[in-house]
A protein has these predicted regions:
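Conserved helix-turn-beta segment of the N-terminal RecA-like "Helicase ATP-binding" lobe
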Residues: 31, 38-64
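Structural beta-sheet core signal
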Residues: 5, 33-34, 123
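Hydrophobic residues on the short alpha-helix immediately C-terminal to a glycine-rich phosphate/catalytic loop
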Residues: 16-24, 44, 111
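Post-DEXD/H (motif II) to motif III coupling segment of the RecA-like Helicase ATP-binding lobe
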Residues: 93, 101-166
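Conserved helix/coil segment N-terminal to the catalytic DExD/H
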Residues: 63-94, 105-110
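Walker A/P-loop
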Residues: 1-22
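Post-Walker A helix-loop "phosphate-sensing" segment adjacent to the P-loop in P-loop NTPases
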Residues: 24-31, 52-56, 119, 146
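Switch/connector loops and helix/strand junctions flanking conserved nucleotide-binding motifs
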Residues: 41-43, 69, 83, 130-135, ...
Length: 169
């Protein structure tokens, strides 16, 4: 089961990641969630707690935190893990990449390659470069692209405020 989900701002990316994580947990799969910054590790962890997840399931991995995995769900920056050997990644049955458009970076591609036994791969992004090569690389890592909803649809459903731009020139 694989997929690359394009989700604009305010479309509920963290809730989607939480839902995928709960599903993987129900299948007894250890889940690795990769985010680009330590502040996003903290934010994602906090969001999970807000959604009702227990802190005892979540392990945050970044500078100053243990990298020995002892919990079912690991939220980490890719910078904290990219030098680890392939064997380290064999424990994960699911990987979820937040801000997946950044996974074209060599370090991130290296991590995804080391997750060769990982059957469940999901990437989420608010933006996707127009370059066909970039899209093909991401689809190779995560699976086919699925547009969840557009910003226009979110505005029409009144989830987002209407956008109005006045030119000053």
């Amino acid at each position: 089961c694989r997929g690359l989900f394009v989700c604009p701002t305010a479309s509920g990316k963290s809730l989607i990641i939480y839902g995928l994580t709960r599903w993987c947990h129900s299948k007894n799969l250890k889940t690795l969630i990769l985010v680009p910054t330590t502040s996003l590790v903290e934010q994602m962890s906090s969001d999970f707690l807000d959604y009702g997840w227990l802190e005892s399931y979540i392990q945050k991995v970044y500078s100053g935190h243990s990298k020995k995995i002892e919990k079912d769900v690991v939220i980490s920056t890719w910078q904290s893990l990219h030098k680890f050997p392939k064997k380290y990644f064999e424990q994960f049955g699911c990987v979820i990449g937040d801000e997946a458009h950044l996974f074209k970076a060599k370090s991130l591609t290296s991590i995804m390659t080391k997750l060769h036994l990982c059957k469940y791969r999901f990437g989420l992004t608010g933006t996707l470069d127009d370059l066909q090569t970039h899209k093909l690389v991401l689809e190779g890592l995560f699976g086919t692209t699925n547009k969840v909803i557009s910003t226009k649809e979110l505005i029409e459903k009144k989830t987002l405020s209407n956008l109005k731009i006045d030119s000053l020139i």
